[in-house]
């Protein structure tokens, strides 16, 4: 079977517009499933309507990335396949995406990245490096070498752009982070300034950064499972070609941007019929991150270690679905600051999206950087629940115990760990200090130096993992330790059954 390439799409007349002639207008940090199935897909829709007319240069965000070589192998082409239900109708539509001009590895081609960053054609920056990407890493500045962190790379790129273009018209950029971090634009800007200060950039750079550049707050919403591993051959047969970057996504999409009129004119999403809202972000952000992303993080470890592989399989499993719904409706929803009827309706819609039979959203993908995700997506709910009830949330803490068990590595894979579920193995990937904490903790359990209860107390005491010292609350430690003990001794299924049998609806938080 032929592989996706420029030659293939040309010979089959699959592209109806001259995308290869469009200038590079977007610098994008990240090239993973989400950006390809959301931002780059949106740019393609605008290009098709002749309202943006630009392409993306995708930058590999970490040294361990594997997408850029695949982009190069396929002439920067890939397919987005939208599958699901929209407005009561089945959507099953695929198209070749041509909005990426090239992918660059900054660790081997840093000067090429800087050259793109200084191009007058570049007007906007997008990023999605996960919550773990918007952090500060102590590192020096070397103009010949890419910084390791994303904010460091962006600071270096902006400095090079300023050095090259100065205060000329159009020298500044619109910077739109898509990471699920509250006030992500402000957070990223502060990190860039912190690097610039540490690297002794001159005051005039800070003035230019403030006056000519705009950092936007955003909220993104689309489930993008990415490559359909289990049905790839069947998909290739339907497509008529092989695509190693095939990206499956749901039809639903929502992009909320807090930005000026400058941003609206630069990115006329709405003119292309895209579901993009401007401003009024905070209410929807709180609801979406806690209900959708929070539930994903809540469910992934306990579901995967119960023997299922995807979100859809978990929702189709009676026991798991019951547990997930109880955790969502009894502990997460009551802590969302919005009218209960509105939140409940949104939650039911989210569960319908989880049940999408066309998607294979792998739980192990949700499990990447899971400790970071737990801290940002579930700890705010945990804190609110404790404040409202004075009690420790049973379902959330069981999920935390499942996460601790999920992070039990059996071998190392470079800087990361490999976990095992019976005959299956999975990658445990997170910040290096997170990996080290779990690796050392589980090694001490394996050698008899720590009991499971002591492991829990040790891990829960680490503020760098959870944002607070969870070991200060004895009942929190006891609940997590008890759940972990049962999970390890009797298995995840029996542990879940025990929680479901113990608890009725009496721990529901009632809003005032």
Swiss-Prot record:
NAD(+) binds at residues 26-37. GO terms for biological process: D-galacturonate catabolic process; mannitol catabolic process. Transmembrane segments: none annotated. Keywords: NAD, Oxidoreductase. It catalyses: D-altronate + NAD(+) = keto-D-tagaturonate + NADH + H(+). SUPFAM superfamilies: 6-phosphogluconate dehydrogenase C-terminal domain-like (SSF48179), NAD(P)-binding Rossmann-fold domains (SSF51735). InterPro entries: 6-PGluconate_DH-like_C_sf, 6PGD_dom2, Altronate_OxRdtase, Mannitol_DH_C, Mannitol_DH_N, NAD(P)-bd_dom_sf. The keyword Lipid metabolism does not apply. Belongs to the mannitol dehydrogenase family. UxaB subfamily. This is Altronate oxidoreductase. It comes from Halalkalibacterium halodurans (strain ATCC BAA-125 / DSM 18197 / FERM 7344 / JCM 9153 / C-125) (Bacillus halodurans). The lineage of its organism: Bacteria, Bacillati, Bacillota, Bacilli, Bacillales.
